[in-house]
Amino acid sequence: MAGRWNLEGCTALVTGGSRGIGYGIVEELASLGASVYTCSRNQKELNDCLTQWRSKGFKVEASVCDLSSRSERQELMNTVANHFHGKLNILVNNAGIVIYKEAKDYTVEDYSLIMSINFEAAYHLSVLAHPFLKASERGNVVFISSVSGALAVPYEAVYGATKGAMDQLTRCLAFEWAKDNIRVNGVGPGVIATSLVEMTIQDPEQKENLNKLIDRCALRRMGEPKELAAMVAFLCFPAASYVTGQIIYVDGGLMANCGF
């Protein structure tokens, strides 16, 4: 089993691991000795990622899953439980989507999709994983939240609402599941350099909004996925055994700025 500062022998499920933040988390956990299972909606992306990870000697498996589907979430957890023989040390609820609109312009379909993937899936997978996390005798759940769960970010009303709900779920599960030796924490990214951000800044107004956020950061730059992944790994280390119920922001100092 793992020492205080590594994850040797641990098992992990990371949702949405084929790109961006999720990809960075899979790499970080695997490089520290964990056996990782991940999922994505895109089979080709998963195949490409698996080739890269296996060339590095990482222990990673993956399958396609549409997390907006309750039945596919159940199937995913059954697969993971079988793969890891009924024990799971780490669940990272990373998968999420954002649709940029003013609050009054969201359709019912927009709202349902964002809620189902960002919040409902994270809650459902956590509940499904509970017996396997408990069986490991040292379980960890990490929710990938956002500064948008605490700040009013333009065109992210529904996205921000899902992250705010996620933060409260983090605190509640931390209390409910402590008796089962399961710690629950959240990591809130600021502006992280991912393909999603690259797509977003193609829109001039969104680029301006993004630059305003970066200007509010003490470090005056975007973060890298590996910088956020390092915090996720820390929270899963035995060395973090007294940390639970926390939302930790990896945001270059954005949340520390009161607006001046």
UniProtKB/Swiss-Prot annotation:
Recorded source organism is Datura stramonium (Jimsonweed)
Gene3D superfamilies for the chain: NAD(P)-binding Rossmann-like Domain (3.40.50.720)
Give the residues the record marks as binding substrate: 146
User: What biological function has been recorded for the protein in this entry?
Assistant: Catalyzes the stereospecific reduction of tropinone to pseudotropine.
Tell me what this protein is called. Answer: Tropinone reductase 2
Instruction: Give the EC number(s) listed in the UniProt record.
Output: 1.1.1.236
Under which pathway is this protein filed? Alkaloid biosynthesis; tropane alkaloid biosynthesis
By sequence similarity, the record places it as follows: Belongs to the short-chain dehydrogenases/reductases (SDR) family.
Q: Which UniProt keywords apply?
A: NADP, Oxidoreductase
Q: Which domain of life is it from?
A: Eukaryota
A GO term for molecular function: tropinone reductase activity
What is an annotated GO biological process for this record, any one? tropane alkaloid biosynthetic process
- Any coiled-coil regions, as ranges: none
The chemistry this enzyme catalyses reads: pseudotropine + NADP(+) = tropinone + NADPH + H(+)
